[in-house]
Amino acid sequence: MDTSVVDWRRVRIFIVFAFGIAWLAALAIYLTGGLAGSPYALLLLVVGYMGAPALAHILTRLVTREGWQNLYLQPKIRQGWPYWIIAWIAPVLFTFAGMAVFFSLFPQFYDPSLSAVQTMLENSAEATGQAVPVLSPWMIVVTQTITALLIAPLLNAIPILGEEFGWRAYLQPKLLPLGGRMTMVWMGIIWGLWHAPIIAMGHNYGLEYPGAPWLGILAMTWFTFVLGTFLGWATLRAGSVWPAVIGHGAINGIAGIALFFIQGEPNLVLGPSIAGLIGSLPIALAALAILLSRNALKLPSLDSREKVQEVFTENTA
C-alpha cells in the first residue's frame, strides 16, 4: 500500500459507514422522543452513535480487505507515557481556564453561591424521598473535579474508544499524506459535521440561541477542530490511540461542571463550557501551538525512521 498518498476510496467508505450508522441512531432518538424524551436516548447515543466510528473502521477494513495492521491499539506506554499524562490532566486545566475567560467577559452569569448545585441536591432528595444532604456546594464541585480527573477517563474509555478507534486510529492516518495541518482541518470538519443531528436536537448548546441549530453545528465544528488537533497530536506522538481515548474521556467527564457556576441564561454556544466558542479558547491556544510547531504533527512510524522523515519532508515542503 502506498502511504504517501491519500487512499480516498477507503476514506469515503469509512465516512459513509461512520455517518450512516450514527445518523440512523440519531433518527431513532428523534422518532422516539428526542434527546430529552426518548427512553432509548442514552443507549442509542453510547452504542449506536459513539460506537459508529469504530464499527465503520472495522467494516471498512473488511469490505476493502485491508487487513489488520496499524490499528493503533498497542498502548506503547514506554514511548508515549508523557502524552498519556498530558492528555489525562490538560482537559481539566483547559476547562477551568475557559470558564475563567468566559466569566471574566460575562460576570453577570457567574454565580459564586453555586445555587445550581443546591438545586440539584434538593431535586435529588425530592426524587429519593430523603433529606437534603448538608454539603457545601463547593465540596460537590471539588469532588466532581477529582472524579473527573481520576476516574472519568477510565470509566469513559470503552464508549470513547468507539469514537477514537475510528477517528484517530483510522481516518487520521488515512488523511496524513495531506500534511499534518491540513489533516487536522479536515478531521475537525468531518468530526464536527458528524455531530450535526444531535446538535440539532439540543446536545451541548440547547436550542435557545440565535441561529439554532446552524450556529451550534458551526461551534461544534470549531470545537472538534481544536480538540481534535490536541487529541491527534497526542496520538501521533504516542503512536497509540489510547492517549486520545483518555483525553476525550477526561473532556467528557469535566465539561459539564461549568453548569454548576451559571446563573441567568448565558448563550451556551459561547460558553462557559469548553465546547463553547469562548470556553474553548485555552484549548484553541494549545491547538495553535501544535499547528505552528513544524514537527508536532509529523507522520507516525511507517517502516523505518528514514521512511518517516522522507514522507514527512515531502508533505511539508
Per-segment meaning from a language model:
Residues 85-109, 187-190, 232-237, 241-248:
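Hydrophobic alpha-helical membrane-insertion segments
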Residues 126-156, 217-227, 280:
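Hydrophobic alpha-helical transmembrane segments
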Residues 125-130, 199-212:
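Membrane-interface interhelical connector segments
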Residues 10-23, 86-94:
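Alpha-helical transmembrane segments
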Residues 1-8:
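Short, Lys/Arg-rich, polar N-terminal cytosolic tail immediately upstream
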Residues 160-193, 232, 236-240:
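Membrane-interface helix/loop boundary segments of multi-pass membrane proteins
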Residues 2, 30-36, 42-92, 101-123, ...:
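Membrane-helix interface linkers and caps
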Residues 62, 207-217, 247-317:
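C-terminal membrane module of polytopic membrane proteins
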